[in-house]
């Protein structure tokens, strides 16, 4: 894994994640759109692109839109303020790994 990712529980017991600044919108994607429902829908589209069944897929959730291409996925914050960066780029395969790790963290939290 290229990025250093840390999962933890906040003081209210909510599952949280720390990621490097260059992929900061992964936090919004996980906490606003995917939450604790797991990421199957998102992973299905990523897999469709990575398997070259499709060259491009797009999915919009509560806060973020994913623009998925084979090499790179653009995560766009639909509600970014004017003074905020509205998007970040992440390698599609890396995003897939983070989503799988999130699903594992959710599963572990609720099967304890």
Name each model-derived stretch:
Residues 107-112:
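Short acidic DE-rich linear segments
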Residues 102-105:
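Extended charged/polar low-complexity repeat regions
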């Amino acid at each position: 894994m290229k990025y250093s990712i840390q999962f933890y529980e906040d003081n209210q017991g909510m599952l949280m994640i720390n990621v490097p600044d260059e992929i900061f919108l992964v936090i919004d994607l996980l906490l606003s759109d995917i939450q604790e429902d797991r990421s199957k829908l998102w992973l299905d589209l990523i897999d469709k692109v990575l398997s070259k069944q499709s060259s491009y897929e797009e999915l919009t959730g509560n806060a973020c839109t994913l623009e998925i291409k084979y090499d790179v996925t653009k995560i766009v914050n639909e509600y970014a303020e004017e003074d905020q960066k509205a998007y970040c780029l992440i390698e599609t395969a890396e995003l897939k790994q983070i989503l799988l790790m999130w699903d594992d963290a959710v599963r572990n939290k609720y099967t304890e």
